[in-house]
Amino acid sequence: MRSLKVYRYFLVIKTKDLGIVNLKLPPKISITKDKLRDFNINKFFYKQIGIDHYWRDRLIWSDKTWSKYALNKNLETWIMKSGKELVGFYEQEYHPSKDEMELINMGILKNYRGKKFGSYLLEHFIKESLKYKPKRLWVHTCSLDHKYALPNYKSKGFNIFKEEVIDFNT
């Protein structure tokens, strides 16, 4: 086991600073909410995408824990497809007590990376979040995530409000 210095970034955008979000998806691309709240989809994406980025906190979760997570009334899971093929996902959680929306996880399956699908997912997150009328949207990312993650957030107007360096054991 070796230790890495990992840079973690917390980003925010105040919704009053957002204009109209015009999301135009490429042909055959769709983004739909998982209305069934099937924890298996969250688990699948977490494992498949996370393996390349050291996502491992949830790997020890039981199916019962996964199910409880997916059934959280404030959580939504959105799935991107190209035709019938899975491309990526994101999870958003509304925090009513703070009047904010958190982007918990977002990722693209390996075969679809580097094709701007992350940008479309982030735009979709912003657009869907505005339906809740939160004061702010926020996300955290780190140096282990995809190299375009941080630039993607910044390009949409998110600003870093907190940075930290942690030791991470691989």
Language model regions located:
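Short acidic/polar active-site loop segments enriched in Thr and Asp
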Residues: 76, 135, 159
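Conserved GNAT acetyl-CoA-binding A-motif
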Residues: 129-141
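Short amphipathic alpha-helix that is part of the acyltransferase structural core
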Residues: 23-58
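Conserved acetyl-CoA-binding loop-helix of GNAT-fold acetyltransferases
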Residues: 105-108, 114-129, 150-155
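Short hydrophobic beta-strand segments in globular cytosolic domains
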Residues: 87, 160-161
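A conserved beta-strand-loop-helix scaffold within acyl/acetyltransferase catalytic domains
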Residues: 59-61, 70-77, 81-100, 104-108
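Acyl-donor-binding surface of acyltransferase catalytic domains
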Residues: 1-35
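Conserved beta-strand-loop-alpha-helix junction that forms the acyl-donor binding cleft
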Residues: 139-149, 166-170
